[in-house]
Amino acid sequence: MSDHSPISNKENHLLPSDSSRSSSSDMHSTGTTGTTGVEPVDFTGEGAKYTTATEGNGGADLAIQRTTTMNSAAESEVNITRRLTKILTGSVNEPDRVEVDYTNCAPMGGDRPYPPSLPSRDLYEVTFDGPNDPLHPFNWPMKKKVLLCLVLCLDSIAIAMCSSIFASAVPQICEIYHVIEVVAILGITLFVLGFAASPVIYAPLSELYGRKGVLVLSAFGFALFQFAVATAENLQTIFICRFFGGFIGAAPMAVVPAAFADMFDTNVRGKAIALFSLGVFVGPILSPVMGSYIAQRTTWRWLEYVVGCFASAVFVAIVLFFEETHHPTILVNKAKQMRKQSNNWGIHAAHEDVELSIKDIVQKTVTRPIIMLFVEPLLLFVTIYNSFVYGILYLLLEAYPLVFVEGYGFTENGELPYIALIIGMMVCAAFIWYMDNDYLKRCRAKGKLVPEARLYAMVIAGTVFPIGILWFCWTGYYPHKIHWMVPTVGGAFIGFGLMGIFLPCLNYIIESYLLLAASAVAANTFMRSAFGACFPLFAGYMFRGMGIGWAGLLLGLFAAAMIPVPLLFLKYGESIRKKSKYAYAA
């Protein structure tokens, strides 16, 4: 589970929709809130109504300062943890069984009668222990969170780097296996297709069974397949192993943002997601720079060996240092430990009550990201914009060598201009970090989460992005007249636009679908990666056939046409979320 509350005096508290005022008052007695004038706000999630208790704007400043401990207090309520489990397992509409019924049960055996009913299960159900429970990820020491973030970011960088480092192997693959360039590029396409497909499986599984198990499995399989590619004897094996390396290794693309949402409240979440976004974009851009040096001095196989060694180190780091962040799974582990220590088998967590068959898992959870993508207009249109931008990133992997190697005659170090892209991304990340303060001010003003306020930075970046594309492509179109530094500087503007569109999109999706953040991000990753897989296939033909300048004009016009997307969501986003079946807050 993740931070699940619009900002109020002490963070919003998720209550079942049938909760009465008296139950709300009981909750107040736990210390989660202690003032009057509470107004309920309804929102929907997975087909059922929920209620959040929010305060007036007067307490909003206090909320910004004290949100870290409030969700722990809210999750100390049995009804809340039980409701959250129903959301994550897709069993919201299934009634709670409150009476013992032995009608269809097998005999106890030994001619024994059926046992009497147990006391209320609420007495045996574990929750978090108030606002300062050290088990709750919001209350973990910052040093611990930083370490976990470092491990998660390295995991994300490993998979992102591997997606594009194969571009440095393409010339050798063409020469050794006697294939044309578009066939060799399939090594990139199949890998990205692999990590387009699997996050829609990994994300729901992480919401059922926790983040760590999914990440460990993914990191281990990813490392193995990198060594398999490096030792492959033929092209078919290379391509098959590249696909499965991407498929198995893609868990970080959906699970890492959800893990960040598990650990950080509204004050810090946006800044933490910025680190993940840098890894997602800097990895594919930095890897050709590194890959060109490796490929020029050794063979293409060492590209895969290097990634495999890096992935192995990340796997060890996850096993040794990563701690489970998924809130319901933490309570499951707490219940297991208490049962072992006390020998009281009745102690349990709400997440253990739901038993799902393979069929249930597929129908209720694994299909959820795809269903969300196509029934949620908010998620669909933001994802289309995000996917187009991500596809541009992989187009640039083809355009840069055409401009700087074929145009300007760079023989070695032809990938160094990529660094301008990275500089632009870092500048944009710093800008969005600054804009996060503006976002928190808007939350204070409304007294709740305002996901649309994340999009103001995207309006600016969306304008800079087509300018950067046109700058880079048209100045790079005349290498004999214009110095190579001019298109290089244009690349910095492209980098600013890439990061400035991707990061607000990701934050917007997470905060709009907070309880189902992993599934929403997986849906986004599915389409985004599909674009990233397809774009390189036609990149060379487009840039060579149309010319760098005219191809850039086409891309720039597409990018300019999408500038209104964040403006539309700024105006209509809140009303769309109110009608949503899955959105968190309205």
Swiss-Prot record:
Q: Where is this region: Disordered?
A: 1-57
Alphabetically list the UniProt keywords: Antiport, Cell membrane, Membrane, Phosphoprotein, Transmembrane, Transmembrane helix, Transport
Q: What is the effect of changing residue 19 to A?
A: Reduces transport activity
**Protein's UniProt keywords contain Transport:** yes
Up-regulation conditions: By transcription factor PDR1, by transcription factor HAA1 in response to acetaldehyde accumulation and by the non-steroidal anti-inflammatory drug indomethacin.
Report any Pfam family annotated for this entry. MFS_1
- What outcome follows a substitution of residue 324 to Q? Loss of function
Q: Which residues carry this modification: Phosphoserine?
A: 19, 72, 76, 91, 342
Task: Write out the topological domains of type Cytoplasmic.
Answer: 1-145, 203-212, 264-271, 323-376, 436-454, 505, 571-586
What CDD domains does the entry give? MFS_Tpo1_MDR_like (cd17323)
Example of a GO MF term: antiporter activity
The protein's name is Polyamine transporter 1
